[in-house]
């Protein structure tokens, strides 16, 4: 008896199985965006407007506002403690909150898809508000971030300065170290995969542990603020504008920091220019 050729049938079966596996992986894989150190009202406006276009295009599953989202000019202790009264003219707590909502928070929420996990990290600048209330207790109940932005009511997860948010196998923190090897310092302290900002420039360090050869990576992100704010006084620095695109499942992730060197323009990981 001559057996019929089964090759084509087997090829189709293999192809179907492969397609099912690819679809399953696509369902499990999620996308995320992280934007750090905007320092409103000293944010890079052209970059922010182009970033919102990317948000609408990507429809991320997770968005991380990584801290120092607002500069908190009205309670800047570096200026107040040194009695630099002239630099405080026109700075008002409520005006900065209202401006942030109008220029950044409201447009962002409109661009994000329904069901997006929204994560808000306080940075050291948001923590300035608590320091100001410690010095001026009459501001309690009026000046706090939550009492003005109502983030929890708007569906945001909120984390105080020093806390972390976990997304898959990644910990998102604001960041705290400013030494030359801050990525290495962060990995050695946390012993996890950590994404952070605070330093306004990209840096990467990976350590492979002797236990099951598990890698731990620390990545510092570029910033979303102006490159030469007034307090810098034209001093040289290593700041870079940009943000993070990331993809993740429960077990794996890939990080794609995007830098914008010229006029808030950038090329996304997809190759599309904004």
Predicted regions and their residues:
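Conserved beta-sheet core of the metallophosphoesterase superfamily
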Residues: 169-263, 271
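Active-site metal-binding loops of divalent metal-dependent hydrolases
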Residues: 36-39, 67-70, 124-126, 175-177, ...
């Amino acid at each position: 008896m001559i057996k019929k050729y089964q090759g084509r049938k087997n090829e189709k079966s293999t192809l179907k199985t492969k397609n099912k596996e690819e679809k399953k992986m696509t369902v499990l894989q999620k996308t995320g965006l992280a934007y750090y150190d905007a320092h409103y009202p000293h944010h890079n406006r052209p970059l922010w407007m182009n970033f919102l276009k990317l948000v609408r295009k990507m429809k991320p599953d997770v968005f991380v506002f990584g801290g120092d989202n607002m500069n908190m000019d009205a309670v800047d202790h570096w200026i107040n403690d040194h009695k630099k009264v002239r630099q405080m003219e026109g700075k008002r707590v409520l005006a900065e909150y209202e401006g942030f909502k109008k220029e950044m928070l409201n447009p962002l929420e409109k661009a994000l898809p329904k069901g997006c996990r929204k994560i808000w990290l306080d940075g050291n600048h948001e923590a300035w508000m608590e320091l100001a209330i410690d010095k001026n207790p009459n501001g309690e109940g009026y000046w706090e971030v939550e009492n003005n932005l109502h983030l929890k009511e708007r569906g945001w997860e909120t984390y105080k300065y020093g806390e972390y948010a976990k997304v898959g196998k990644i910990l998102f923190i604001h960041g705290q170290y400013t030494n030359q090897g801050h990525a290495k310092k962060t990995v050695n302290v946390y012993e996890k995969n950590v994404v952070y900002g605070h330093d306004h420039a990209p840096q990467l360090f990976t350590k492979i542990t002797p236990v099951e050869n598990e890698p731990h990576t620390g990545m510092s992100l570029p910033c979303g603020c102006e490159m030469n704010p007034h307090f810098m006084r034209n001093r040289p620095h290593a700041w870079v504008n940009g943000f993070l695109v990331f993809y993740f499942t429960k077990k794996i992730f890939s990080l794609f920091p995007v830098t914008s060197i010229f006029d808030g323009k950038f090329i996304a990981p997809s190759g599309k220019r904004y």
